[in-house]
């Protein structure tokens, strides 16, 4: 983990849109995978206190937004906040329910936690596919004294509509003009490099 990058890529507050159906014996929701562990605990506590159930499906922020707009669930959750115009047009309310951070991690044999450092532009170049080897001079330049193997870098990212993706590419767009012009921002982008996994569990 690269702790020095945490403040720069802190996630937006999770936005939850609530449809008015408070009398339902079972409340249904869908959306961000990021909040699923907390949602599971809240659902359990809510059930103990009220005897009512919350059925939350962690299908990704994009799916949650689509379902709450379609009216197929009582609430949706997304790491990427909706704009005021979008909320008004859909008749939705939005409020923050949790906050988290997106932190890049690596799986490189022989490296200790916190040993490898990156800059924002360097991360952008890796995700753009411009830097493909661990022993690239650009990586070595910001990691003096660290010897990197001649191994290919395999980038892993979300394949589904994701608030985690939104937060990550929003950061890359701020630190890299090349990323901003070629890829841009959104809950779903055309990734220049890497393998896609569905949900945070798929990436892990």
Predicted regions and their residues:
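Flexible loop/hinge segments at secondary-structure junctions
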Residues: 24-204
């Amino acid at each position: 983990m690269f702790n020095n990058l945490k403040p720069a890529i802190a996630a937006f507050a999770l936005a939850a849109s609530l449809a008015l159906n408070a009398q339902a014996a079972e409340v249904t929701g869908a959306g961000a995978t990021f909040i699923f562990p907390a949602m599971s605990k809240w659902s359990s506590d809510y059930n103990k206190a009220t005897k009512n159930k919350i059925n939350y499906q962690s299908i990704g922020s994009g799916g949650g937004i689509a379902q709450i707009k379609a009216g197929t669930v009582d609430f949706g959750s997304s790491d990427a906040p909706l704009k005021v115009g979008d909320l008004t047009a859909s008749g939705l309310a939005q409020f923050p329910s949790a906050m988290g951070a997106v932190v890049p991690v690596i799986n490189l044999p022989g490296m200790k936690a916190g040993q490898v450092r990156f800059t924002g532009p360097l991360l952008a170049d890796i995700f753009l596919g411009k830097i493909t080897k661990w022993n690239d001079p650009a990586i070595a330049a910001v990691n003096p004294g660290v010897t990197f193997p001649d191994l290919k870098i395999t980038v892993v990212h979300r394949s589904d509509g994701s608030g985690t993706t939104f937060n990550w590419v929003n950061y890359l767009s701020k630190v890299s003009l090349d990323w901003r012009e070629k890829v841009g921002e959104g809950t779903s982008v055309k990734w220049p490099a890497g393998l896609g996994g569905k949900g945070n569990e798929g990436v892990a």
